[in-house]
């Protein structure tokens, strides 16, 4: 998935946007008097909803790739995403930025690390969705913002405000409840949340555009993907070319499936406020959860509902506190500017 994030991507990934050269700036704040602000923000909202909506709806896409196994699907996604991203880098004229990444050893190593982490994330997500654990995968993306904050405390030494601590404690209680319910740790959710949190941290540190970044990341792991696919062909275990043209085209389409929501997100990030993107990020796990429960009929005993309700309470507290804090900071900035 992306989860993309693909916290889909978290609000912290906003500056890693993609698009045309004019769309790759940092998110803009439109003054109320600006005549094009409202249409631009509406367009951005539509693009943001499209991005997160697609990430959520792809829950129904990955099972279509069976009888290919999760690792074969992953290998094809890496390969076709690399080719798709390479083409888009040329189309959007990002080759200069790509060369700069390759010339900077530190940035390249950060993206190489990100490549390994997102590979784990993609593999876990595909495995979960194709093994009737869609609800558990949605949990991973619900708790991802909280895990990202926790990693900020543990790795970056950031300080939390009281309500942020409260949200983390409630979310921790939810994990305990769900562990008892499942009879095991909800490992799929935890791997998804922590892998995407780590991915976001590495990308934030690298601070490069998402399009050329993903082109580099998929190129780093492409040799492993190609080697695995070659082994499948050599052993007669490959589904590509043996399950019909439709199946082969679906595997090829994994590159487009990866690219389209990423482009929508990048275009949205330049048009809507951070707070709006922060709220939109919950659309993907909400759709995943709804599809898992109401379409795919996954079991939801009472204890599991309790665990998820606790997660949602934690997210309400976390989001409300973050929104209020952002507004206070804006007011302070306005007052400081007026005083100057």
Language model regions located:
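Membrane-interface interhelical linkers
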Residues: 7, 22-50, 83-111, 162, ...
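Glycine-/small-residue-enriched transmembrane alpha-helix faces in small-molecule transporters
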Residues: 16, 31-72, 173-205, 291, ...
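Hydrophobic alpha-helical transmembrane segments of multi-pass membrane transport proteins
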Residues: 53-57, 61, 112-129, 191-202, ...
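Structural motif at transmembrane-helix junctions in multi-pass transporters
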Residues: 67-72, 123-140, 263-280, 299
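Hydrophobic transmembrane alpha-helices of multi-pass small-molecule transport proteins
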Residues: 85, 163-179, 188-194, 303-322
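C-terminal transmembrane-helix exit sites in multi-pass transporters
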Residues: 127, 144-164, 286-305
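Helix-helix packing/entry segments at the starts of transmembrane helices
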Residues: 139-143, 210-220, 259-294
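C-terminal-most transmembrane helix of multi-pass membrane proteins
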Residues: 180-181, 185, 282-340
């Amino acid at each position: 998935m992306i989860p993309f994030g693909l916290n889909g991507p978290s609000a912290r990934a906003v500056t890693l946007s993609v698009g045309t050269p004019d769309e790759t700036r940092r998110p803009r704040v439109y003054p109320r008097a600006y005549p094009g602000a409202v249409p631009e923000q509406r367009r951005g909202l539509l693009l943001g909803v499209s991005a997160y909506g697609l990430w959520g709806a792809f829950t129904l896409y990955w099972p279509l790739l069976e009888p290919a196994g999760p690792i074969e699907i992953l290998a094809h996604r890496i390969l076709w995403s690399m080719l798709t991203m390479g083409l888009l880098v040329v189309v959007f004229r990002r080759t200069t930025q790509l060369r700069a990444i390759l010339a900077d050893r530190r940035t390249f190593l950060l993206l190489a690390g990100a490549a390994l982490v997102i590979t784990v994330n993609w593999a876990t997500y595909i495995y979960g969705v194709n093994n009737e654990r869609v609800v558990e995968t949605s949990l991973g993306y619900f708790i991802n913002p909280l895990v990202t904050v926790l990693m900020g405390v543990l790795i970056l030494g950031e300080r939390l405000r009281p309500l942020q601590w409260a949200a983390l404690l409630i979310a921790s209680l939810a994990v305990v409840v769900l562990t008892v319910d499942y009879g095991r740790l909800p490992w799929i959710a935890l791997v998804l949340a922590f892998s995407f949190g780590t991915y976001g941290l590495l990308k934030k540190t690298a601070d490069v555009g998402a399009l050329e970044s993903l082109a580099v990341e998929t190129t780093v792991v492409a040799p492993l993907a190609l080697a695995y696919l070659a082994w499948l062909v050599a052993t007669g275990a490959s589904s590509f070319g043996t399950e019909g043209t439709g199946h082969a085209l679906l595997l090829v389409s994994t590159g487009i499936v990866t690219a389209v929501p990423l482009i929508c997100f990048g275009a949205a990030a330049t048009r809507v406020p951070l707070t709006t993107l922060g709220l939109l990020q919950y659309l993907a796990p909400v759709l995943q959860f709804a599809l898992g429960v109401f379409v795919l009929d996954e079991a939801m005993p009472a204890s599991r509902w309790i665990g998820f309700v606790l997660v949602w309470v934690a997210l309400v507290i976390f989001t409300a506190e973050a929104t209020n804090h952002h507004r206070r900071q804006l007011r302070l900035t306005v007052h400081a500017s007026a005083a100057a």
